[in-house]
Amino acid sequence: MTKQFAVIGNPIEQSRSPELHHAFAEKTGVDLNYQKRLAPLDGFESSMRSFFAEGGSGMNVTVPFKEQAFALCDVLTERAQIAKAVNTLWMENGKLHGDNTDGQGLVAAIQALEWNLENTTILILGAGGATRGVIYPLVQAGAQKIVIANRTLARAEQLVDDLKTAVPQAQLQAISLNDLEGDFDIVINATSTSLSGDALQLPEKLQFKYAYEMAYGKPSSFIDQAKQRNVPYAEGFGMLVGQAIEAFYIWNGVRPQLKDFL
């Protein structure tokens, strides 16, 4: 029987999840159908529950419903608990299960680039949900120190305080975006500047070996500046594929190879 999957969000037309999951299915022989579902801003829960009531096997959650999905789950994975957001849902024994595969997607993308994560010092620009979701997987993959920089310092400090309890083995620090300096192995842009077009200026006293832009398919001043410095860079398509592979694995027990889809 064909398994039914969907991605839910608002807006949703931009999602590439259906093409990815159908490509994984073709490669692995899983019989599935994967659709986009647009939910009204006030109608996530009813839309999600009706999908599972109709026999849906699994659902991906995108903006702006990840925090709501987290709140509705009966059972959460450790990484979802730390992220406080869920992008992957499934029903098991009548209970709604939730996971967050975004951080694992980022780690898989970085590893596919053969950028070392062991004992690294990483700078993440931005202190929003995207950053919260990737800290724990980065630490698990070997990152030694993670510095979170944000325009509003208090928000970065709050995030570090929250995560220190959840990820005690991590060396975490909060700074203001105005105080960017020092040497880092990898800089990750998790701000929405690449989406809104606000140019983010990286000062000369900030040095880094690699640059990763979480967004993809749009002009990015962050990537432009990495190019000017001749620093190896990548944008977020690999992360998108990586998080989709992890969700596919949770649902179907088969893990496609990331390199086959980049």
From Swiss-Prot:
It comes from the Bacteria. GO terms for molecular function: NADP binding; shikimate 3-dehydrogenase (NADP+) activity. One of its GO terms (biological process) is shikimate metabolic process. Keywords: Amino-acid biosynthesis, Aromatic amino acid biosynthesis, NADP, Oxidoreductase. NADP(+) binds at residues 78, 126-130, 150-155, 214, 236. It catalyses: shikimate + NADP(+) = 3-dehydroshikimate + NADPH + H(+). It is an enzyme of class 1 (oxidoreductase). The keyword Membrane does not apply. InterPro entries: Aminoacid_DH-like_N_sf, NAD(P)-bd_dom_sf, SDH_C, Shikimate_DH, Shikimate_DH-bd_N, Shikimate_DH_fam, Shikm_DH/Glu-tRNA_Rdtase. GO terms for cellular component: cytosol. NCBIfam families: aroE, PRK00258.1-2. Involved in the biosynthesis of the chorismate, which leads to the biosynthesis of aromatic amino acids. Catalyzes the reversible NADPH linked reduction of 3-dehydroshikimate (DHSA) to yield shikimate (SA). This is Shikimate dehydrogenase (NADP(+)). The gene is aroE.
